[in-house]
């Protein structure tokens, strides 16, 4: 929390208190099947340093000088330093998989209120949190979600995973089931797996479930 106090001999009249988030803003894009991480700094004369191995950055780590490019799963942590001291930080976890850079074809549109970042959000490697309005979840209203992903070539897959959110107080529920179909020509499909949801429809809280 934040505490504010005024030290003075008499009565103080306060009209407005404003607080600003000085944390660096991190955004990601998919480039050539890999990731590009962009960092925006709001601290004057601050210096952004980052790591890709999950460590908290220190004053000796790599200086951010432009988009950070890589093509593997990584936890990107960045911090703004000034005078050798870390003043603010941010992080993002990116997961590499075979559908990176392959936006799905959807039979039903996603909600304009919950785009998750656009057409490639379902396969961009960024996981949503437990908060439905964090900007990373893509929402579908009433219609079933059916997504077809063209990997560009025949690929041997061992696992297909999808993450879903339930928050009954916000009228968000997990799917009743998750089915996976495969095709070699994009025309003839056969079922290769299915998972039924076992979470009660009335279970409250912010639930993130992975179906595989």
Residue spans of the language-model regions?
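Short, compositionally stereotyped local motifs that mark structural "simplifiers"
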Residues: 22-145
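Short beta-strand-plus-loop segments that form exposed binding edges in beta-rich domains
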Residues: 3-9
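Aromatic, loop-rich ligand-recognition surfaces of beta-strand-rich domains
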Residues: 11, 16, 20-21, 128-195, ...
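Short acidic, glycine-rich loop/turn motifs
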Residues: 6, 80-82, 184
């Amino acid at each position: 929390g934040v505490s504010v106090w005024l030290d003075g001999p008499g009565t103080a009249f306060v009209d407005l208190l404003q607080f600003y988030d000085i944390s660096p803003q991190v955004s990601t894009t998919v480039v050539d099947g890999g990731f590009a991480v962009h960092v925006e700094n709001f601290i004057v004369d601050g210096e952004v340093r980052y790591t890709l191995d999950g460590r908290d950055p220190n004053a000796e780590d790599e200086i951010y000088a432009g988009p950070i490019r890589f093509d593997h799963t990584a936890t990107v942590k960045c911090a703004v330093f000034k005078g050798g001291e870390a003043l603010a930080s941010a992080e993002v976890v990116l997961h590499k998989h075979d559908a990176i850079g392959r936006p799905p074809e959807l039979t039903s549109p996603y909600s304009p209120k919950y785009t998750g970042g656009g057409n490639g959000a379902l396969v961009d490697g960024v996981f949503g949190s437990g908060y439905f309005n964090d900007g990373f979840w893509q929402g579908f209203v009433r219609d079933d979600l059916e997504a077809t992903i063209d990997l560009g070539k025949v690929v041997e897959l061992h696992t297909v995973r999808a993450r879903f959110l339930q928050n009954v107080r916000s009228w968000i529920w997990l799917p009743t089931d998750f089915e996976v179909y495969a095709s070699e020509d994009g025309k003839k499909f056969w079922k290769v797996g299915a998972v039924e949801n076992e979470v009660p429809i009335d279970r409250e809280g912010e639930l993130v479930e992975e179906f595989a």
